[in-house]
A protein has these predicted regions:
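Class I SAM-dependent methyltransferase SAM/SAH-binding core
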Residues: 41-82
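A short acidic, Gly/Pro-enriched loop at the edge of an enzyme's catalytic core
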Residues: 84-93
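A short SAM/SAH-binding and catalytic strip from SAM-dependent methyltransferases
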Residues: 93-105
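A short glycine-rich, Lys/Arg-flanked "PGG" loop and its adjoining helix->strand segment in the class I
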Residues: 107-122
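Short alpha-helix
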Residues: 161-179, 184
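A C-terminal cap/extension of S-adenosyl-L-methionine-dependent methyltransferases
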Residues: 183-240
């Protein structure tokens, strides 16, 4: 494994700026026990490892072989199976960036996140935003066919990872009612609109772009068209009530009507 020190200049400019924006949005995290799930080559795990106890989980052995190791963190190879090895309420913070779109068992993964997360612990999820992808297809790639396909609710495609299975921000709360979205921010609202690739390399331009991206990231009208959403979720102590799975039986409805007619405050009891 290459133990040479690496920094963000080793990444393409768009990826370097994406990391910096996400890290700024995360704020200063210290002295926390963290999982980075789907850690890739470990750029974020390495960054957080400087001041935290970090465990990175990644299924791709090639990515693990190329991982960044400037700072100390524990690397595990695997997926949701590795999450199941941890006891309940073990971690303070979970990182999951651009991962759930590429999995079929994402609801199970999110529920495992909640299980291993301490009460009031937080999860950082970066996810694709369908509207932003439509913008990309039309403005940058001139691909109207794919834009129409996305607007019709179909999946997208990433050259490196395959099908992008889009989901809505609120789906996460539906998969696991213990989790509540406390913050939503946009990412890459303007960054990719600049098609002059040479200017992307200009450090001064990068700083100005990051500044304006951060400024609009909390504004809903810009979040709506951002390429990505950055969600912060918190584990609550109280589970929210789930909607009923079936409609009330005809017998219950009849008894409710009878109770109303008699003007009585009758407590209904379902009979099997």
């Amino acid at each position: 494994m290459n133990k040479m020190s690496k920094n963000l200049t080793a990444l393409p400019p768009w990826e370097s700026m994406l990391k910096r924006i996400v890290w700024k949005q995360l704020g200063d995290i210290r002295n926390k026990k963290i999982i980075d799930f789907g850690s890739g080559i470990g750029v974020t795990a390495d960054y957080l490892g400087k001041n935290n106890d970090v465990i990175a989980i990644e299924p791709n052995e090639g990515s693990v072989a190329a991982r960044w190791t400037n700072n100390q963190y524990m690397q595990m190879i695997g997926s949701v199976d590795r999450l199941r090895e941890f006891a309940d309420e073990t971690f303070d913070f979970i990182i999951c960036h651009n991962v759930l779109e590429y999995t079929e068992d994402r609801a199970d993964i999110v529920r495992e996140f909640a299980r291993v997360l301490k009460p009031h612990g937080k999860i950082s999820i970066v996810k694709h935003n369908r509207a932003g992808r439509v913008m990309q297809m039309i403005v940058l790639l001139n691909d109207f066919e794919k834009a129409h396909s996305l607007l019709s609710g179909n999946d997208g495609m990433a050259s490196k990872y395959g099908a992008i299975h889009y989901y809505e921000d609120a789906d996460i709360e539906n998969w696991c009612p213990e989790l509540t979205i406390t913050q939503t921010r946009g990412i890459r609202t303007f960054l990719d609109m600049q098609q002059n690739q040479e200017i992307h390399k200009d450090v001064g331009w990068q700083e100005k772009m990051i500044e304006i991206e951060m400024r609009v990231s909390d504004m809903k009208e810009y979040q709506d068209i951002a390429f990505f959403h950055h969600l912060i979720l918190e584990k609550t102590n109280k589970k929210r009530a789930m909607p009923p799975l079936t409609k009330p039986s005809i017998h219950v409805k009849m008894r409710e009507t009878l109770s109303e007619r008699q003007g009585q405050n009758v407590k209904l009891e379902d009979k099997k």
